[in-house]
């Protein structure tokens, strides 16, 4: 069947001879539609309901076919609210999957799951569209080169470095700083690497989406005066959206990123906040489609759905997609099927700790729980590897001694253990860092610390050269020279108080 390029609906192609059906049943966001015999739409085809409700308001709902039920009926999931729909309304089969605009015209704009701009800046001037359901790159096209992606955040670059073109998970419960860390990464990467980013807001708070947009405009990541010079495209399917939209918005963002990689041959950063909400939406849809729930009430197709998204995030010989995904951990339980399934796909994990956050150490990245497949001497070099291992050993010994300290006090420790504890506390504080995106709240200017500077700083602490400096001097500073300067300032303040 031929497609009509002059579609009245952005990102969705319609066919010359309309294939129409009628709504048979509506259960929340799920529609059953009856089509004429022999005219059933394919799985993943987009269906459109265009009508008027009882108050004579325009209805324009796009759905996606999920199941073929028999008796010429299909079951589809709506991408927007189904308010006003009634049985018997006409449904048009577009003859194609959902397609979204791609290319340079998407930068600086905010889209919904259908690829429609929602920022009141007018239509998107893009002739190119891609379907959101695409195959993962063929094995022969993949690029297997290993290299580090420098973020400018000390704890990440030293202890759990990110792979260029890899997948990174940010794990943490509610309110420990996942979204702030993502905003800092977007800021640092846009400024230090000049990379193009795509941000997929999957099932998170609308307020956070708005805050992120405003923050990006302030920092220049989105250029209001010349929108084409922006470094990021935003795709939002927030908490108030139906589960169908939240389940597919990650694919919309990924499709836009794939265009930059495959056609523009660029290195792209794909941020997904939050991948757990993608699983959660899939769970809601699965129940509505009548599938039997699996472990902890999740959908039986959890691994398949996650795999179909994650396998498309890959580096090819044309370009790369480096993906950073925030993962909400329900009740801080890392064995929950949603975070556990996500773990299998990741090259690095950045685990955020509530204990560190309660101490006021930000970013609250747990240095012992965070891991990376890149932390090997043949990839990062011996100096980096040995420094990271010594930092971890010192922090691990401090963790083991904490029970003894709590019961008997520091005085009962050996001289060597006391020294280890003192250095570990300095390391713990030096792993904190002022963020550019938090300047407004803290009043401290943000700091970007290069990898070489980070390694030098921790080597100086481990060597004992800075044993004479107070712990507080290492808290919320950039490189090690700032810690030395802060120590002098603290000493002068103490003298003036006396």
From Swiss-Prot:
Its main location: plastid. Keywords: ATP synthesis, ATP-binding, CF(1), Chloroplast, Hydrogen ion transport, Ion transport, Membrane, Nucleotide-binding, Plastid, Thylakoid, Translocase, Transport. SMART domains: AAA. It is found in: Plastid, Chloroplast thylakoid membrane. Its EC number is 7.1.2.2. GO terms for biological process: proton motive force-driven mitochondrial ATP synthesis. Produces ATP from ADP in the presence of a proton gradient across the membrane. The catalytic sites are hosted primarily by the beta subunits. PANTHER family: ATP SYNTHASE, ATP SYNTHASE SUBUNIT BETA, MITOCHONDRIAL. Belongs to the ATPase alpha/beta chains family. This is ATP synthase subunit beta, chloroplastic. The gene is atpB.
């Amino acid at each position: 069947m031929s497609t009509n390029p002059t579609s009245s609906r952005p990102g969705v192609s319609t066919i010359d001879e309309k294939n129409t059906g009628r709504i048979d049943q509506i259960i929340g966001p799920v529609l059953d539609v009856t089509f004429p015999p022999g005219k059933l739409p394919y799985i993943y085809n987009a269906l459109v309901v265009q009508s008027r409700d009882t108050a004579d308001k325009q209805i324009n709902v796009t759905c996606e076919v999920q199941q073929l039920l028999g008796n010429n009926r299909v079951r589809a999931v709506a991408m927007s609210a189904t308010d006003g729909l009634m049985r018997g309304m006409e449904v048009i089969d577009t003859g194609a999957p959902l397609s979204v605009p791609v290319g340079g015209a998407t930068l600086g704009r905010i889209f919904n799951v259908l690829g429609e701009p929602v920022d009141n800046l007018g239509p998107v001037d893009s002739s190119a569209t891609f379907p959101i359901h695409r195959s993962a790159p063929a094995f022969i096209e993949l690029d297997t080169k290993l290299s580090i992606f420098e973020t400018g955040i000390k704890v990440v670059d030293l202890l759990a470095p990110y792979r260029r073109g890899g997948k990174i998970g940010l794990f943490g419960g509610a309110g420990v700083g996942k979204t702030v860390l993502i905003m800092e990464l977007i800021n640092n990467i846009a400024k230090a690497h000049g990379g193009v980013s795509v941000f997929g807001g999957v099932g998170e708070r609308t307020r956070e989406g708005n805050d992120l947009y405003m923050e990006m405009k302030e920092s220049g990541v989105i250029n209001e005066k010349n929108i084409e010079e922006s470094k990021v495209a935003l795709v939002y399917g927030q908490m108030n959206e139906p589960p169908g939209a939240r389940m597919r918005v990650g694919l919309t963002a990924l499709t836009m990123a794939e265009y930059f990689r495959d056609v523009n041959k660029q290195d792209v950063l794909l941020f997904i906040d939050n991948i757990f909400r993608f699983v959660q939406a899939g769970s809601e849809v699965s129940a509505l489609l009548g599938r039997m729930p699996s472990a902890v009430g999740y959908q039986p197709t959890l691994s398949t759905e996650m795999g179909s998204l994650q396998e498309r995030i890959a580096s090819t010989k044309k370009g790369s997609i480096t993906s950073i995904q925030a993962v909400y951990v329900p009740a801080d339980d890392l064995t929950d099927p949603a975070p556990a399934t996500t773990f299998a796909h990741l090259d690095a994990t950045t685990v955020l700790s509530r204990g560190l956050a309660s101490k006021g150490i930000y970013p609250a990245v747990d240095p012992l729980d965070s891991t990376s497949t890149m932390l090997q001497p043949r990839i990062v070099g011996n100096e980096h590897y040995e420094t990271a291992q010594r930092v971890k050993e010192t922090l691990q010994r401090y963790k083991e001694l904490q029970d003894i300290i709590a019961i008997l006090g520091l005085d009962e420790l050996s001289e060597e253990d006391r020294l280890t504890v003192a250095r570990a506390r300095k390391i713990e504080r030096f792993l904190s860092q002022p963020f550019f995106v938090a300047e407004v709240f803290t009043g401290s200017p943000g700091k970007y610390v290069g990898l070489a500077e980070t390694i030098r700083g921790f080597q100086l602490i481990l060597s004992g050269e800075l044993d004479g400096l107070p712990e507080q001097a290492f808290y919320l500073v950039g490189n090690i020279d700032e810690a030395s300067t802060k120590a002098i300032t603290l000493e002068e303040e103490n003298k003036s108080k006396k």
